[in-house]
């Protein structure tokens, strides 16, 4: 399981690098070519501008609506990923028991461990890699959305509320909101896990700082995207991975197991007393 966590962490870092690397790319125009620029990002850019015109040439609303549309489109992938992750968390105690049982490092024992793990995964309908496939599909979409907003020059000429979309937020409202929503979504997801590791905890506190510093120094169009996307992520986490509900259910299961063991122990003692009579 640690191996898969490391892979997920590496993917997260890769996503950050790819997203931030988009800051130095050239503007997207009708003359942009190639699969990534000419097909993906250009059409994302056109969709945002079309929506902006639909809402009275408001580029701010265009960014908001298109961001929400993209997040809703990839929501089924998130549902699948979250359910698989929750199922993986639930089988953790059984996985640890198997690892303890087959703790020897010789090849034969490790083969038995792998066979038992496969049976456990099949029984509960989960697989570690199943959580990564949706992530690999989502990342290019979200990166394309990010770059479409960053590299579409027309979006930087508009205004929205107190913002000039091509300039930094003068009051730092959007950077602060983006950081708050980033922390909230990460914290909620972390609290839903039965065990928190150091990597998860570090990223929960590190990512909001990165988002805050970056959002302070980029045009408001990009900060607006981060606010909407991360606010959606908070709602999504509360819907799919609500830690308060999950922890209540987890505690109820533990209490039921304690009650079952207590009942069995009482029955055992009663049987011993009756036998002595």
Curated annotation (Swiss-Prot):
Family: Belongs to the OXA1/ALB3/YidC family. Type 2 subfamily.
Membrane-spanning ranges: 35-55, 60-80, 130-150, 170-190, 208-228
Membrane topology classification: Multi-pass membrane protein
Gene Ontology biological process terms, A to Z: protein insertion into membrane; protein transport
Ranges of compositional bias, category Basic residues: 267-277
Protein name (record): Membrane protein insertase YidC 2
Signal peptide: 1-22
Region (Disordered): 251-277
């Amino acid at each position: 399981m640690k191996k898969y966590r490391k892979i997920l962490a590496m993917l997260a870092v890769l996503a950050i690098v790819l997203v931030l690397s988009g800051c130095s790319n050239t503007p997207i125009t009708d003359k942009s070519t190639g699969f990534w620029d000419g097909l993906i990002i250009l059409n994302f850019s056109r969709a945002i501008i079309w929506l902006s015109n639909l809402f009275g040439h408001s580029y701010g609303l265009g960014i908001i609506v298109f961001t929400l549309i993209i997040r809703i489109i990839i929501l089924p992938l998130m549902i699948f990923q979250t359910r698989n992750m929750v199922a993986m968390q639930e089988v953790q105690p059984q996985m640890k028991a198997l690892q303890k049982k087959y703790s020897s490092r010789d090849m034969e024992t490790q083969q038995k461990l792998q066979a038992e793990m496969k049976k456990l995964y099949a029984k509960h309908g989960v697989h570690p890699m199943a959580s990564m496939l949706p992530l690999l599909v989502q990342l290019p979409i979200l990166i394309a959305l990010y770059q479409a907003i960053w590299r579409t020059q027309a979006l930087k000429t508009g205004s929205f509320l107190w913002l000039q979309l091509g300039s930094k937020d003068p009051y730092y409202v959007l950077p602060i909101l983006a950081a708050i929503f980033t922390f909230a979504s990460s914290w909620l997801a972390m609290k839903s896990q039965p065990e928190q590791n150091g990597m998860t905890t570090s990223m929960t506190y590190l990512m909001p700082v990165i988002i805050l510093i970056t959002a302070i120094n980029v045009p408001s169009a990009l900060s607006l995207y981060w606010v909407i996307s991360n606010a959606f992520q908070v709602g999504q986490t509360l819907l799919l991975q609500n830690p308060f509900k999950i922890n209540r259910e987890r505690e109820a299961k533990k209490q039921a197991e304690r009650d079952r063991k207590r009942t069995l122990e009482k029955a055992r003692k009663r049987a011993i007393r009756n036998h002595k009579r």
